A protein has these predicted regions:
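Conserved AdoMet/S-adenosylmethionine-binding subsite of the radical SAM
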Residues: 1-123
Length: 124
């Protein structure tokens, strides 16, 4: 990805009429990968941080919350266990949370409704 990253950022800037979603599980590398004129983000870019379990949420989300990103969202997919993100949502910087299960014949975890109901109530 490094060899074409600058080209992609230029395209995103040029196409301000489109909204771009960037999904990453490597949020700790974010500052290494943004363009010089990023400031606190582009108006047409939302960054999604993935967290599949509580351990990763507690590692990635504090980093994510502190980054200069205008539009922030979380993806729990595959959501492998119940995840408590209440303290991260209380910051007011997370605009959306998406939850999804694991797919395929070899899936290790079946998403239980209780996993996402708790997150739903935190958001309300």
């Amino acid at each position: 990805a490094d060899q074409w990253r600058e080209e992609v950022w230029n395209f995103i800037k040029i196409r301000s009429d489109l909204n771009f979603i960037i999904i990453t599980k490597r949020i700790h590398r974010f500052l290494e990968c943004i363009p010089e004129d990023w400031n606190n983000g582009y108006n047409n870019v939302t960054i999604y941080c993935t967290c599949e379990n509580q351990k990763m949420a507690d590692y990635r989300l504090p980093i994510f919350i502190d980054l200069p990103i205008k539009y922030k969202a979380i993806i729990h997919e595959p959501m492998l266990e119940e995840i408590n993100i209440e303290k991260y949502l209380q910051t007011g910087v997370i605009e959306q949370v998406i939850c999804g299960g694991e797919s395929g014949e070899d899936k290790k975890c079946i998403l239980k409704p209780s996993f996402y109901f708790k997150i739903h109530f935190f958001i309300l």
